[in-house]
């Protein structure tokens, strides 16, 4: 998984550079597929029943599971790219949100807080720690800024399958105090949040989740290995 994680980190970085004003979502999707194949690996998301793409791409009020289509990126958009791959039978998953062109100070702060929230959550991914501690650390950062932590979707275990136990909510659940981390687990830890009400609705395509109130969203995700010495981010750029 470390080899796959390094490759996915590089792909994520290249897709961010590629996603400029005037580029379409489907162009990003095509680029992602080429990069995954050039790395000698396979797309992960297209193994999900009914989903036929290598990426999920969203902007602004759309948070996740967005089908890459002919939408064009404009200056001021907040773009989210979620991409996964399979290497030697193991899935890895990562997501980044970023502004394109001219974005506001408010938007920039919004993105910075998401990155901080994810960092605090990952720091809790230690042997013997609970899922509750991860969720609480994530949620605390968001609440301090009056942002909404998404409660309808979660992070997850990842490895031989794309979605595995445990589920890792963005909102702390006291019952998750009983779910303890063990050495060697790999987790897709993701912060999903909104500038307004975090309630989500699903588009007519039956995939794309977006905020009901139309507020701005973002998502940051890394695949993390739980080791005896602490968390190791497999999809972090080297």
Regions inferred by a protein language model and the residue ranges of each:
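Active-site neighborhoods and metal-handling regions in enzymes and metal-associated proteins
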Residues: 1-238
């Amino acid at each position: 998984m470390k080899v796959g994680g390094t490759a996915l980190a590089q792909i994520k970085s290249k897709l961010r550079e590629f996603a400029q004003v005037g580029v379409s979502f489907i162009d990003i999707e095509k680029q992602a597929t080429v990069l995954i194949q050039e790395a000698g690996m396979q797309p992960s998301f297209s193994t999900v029943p009914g989903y036929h793409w290598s990426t999920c791409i969203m902007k602004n009020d759309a948070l996740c599971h967005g089908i890459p289509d002919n939408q064009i990126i404009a200056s001021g958009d907040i773009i989210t790219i979620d991409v996964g791959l399979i290497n030697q039978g193991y899935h890895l998953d990562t997501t980044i949100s970023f502004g394109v062109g001219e974005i506001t100070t408010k938007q920039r702060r919004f993105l910075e807080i998401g990155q901080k929230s994810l960092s605090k959550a990952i720091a809790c991914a230690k042997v013997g720690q609970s899922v509750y501690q991860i969720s609480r650390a994530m949620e605390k950062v968001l609440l301090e800024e009056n942002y909404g932590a998404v409660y309808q979707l979660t992070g997850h275990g990842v490895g031989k399958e794309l979605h595995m136990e445990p589920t890792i909510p963005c909102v702390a659940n006291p019952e998750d105090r009983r779910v303890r981390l063990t050495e060697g687990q790999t987790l897709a830890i993701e912060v999903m949040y909104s500038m307004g009400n975090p309630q989500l609705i699903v588009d007519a395509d039956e995939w794309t989740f977006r905020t009901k109130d139309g507020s701005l969203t973002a998502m940051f995700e890394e695949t993390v290995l739980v080791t005896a010495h602490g968390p190791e981010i497999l999809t972090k750029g080297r």
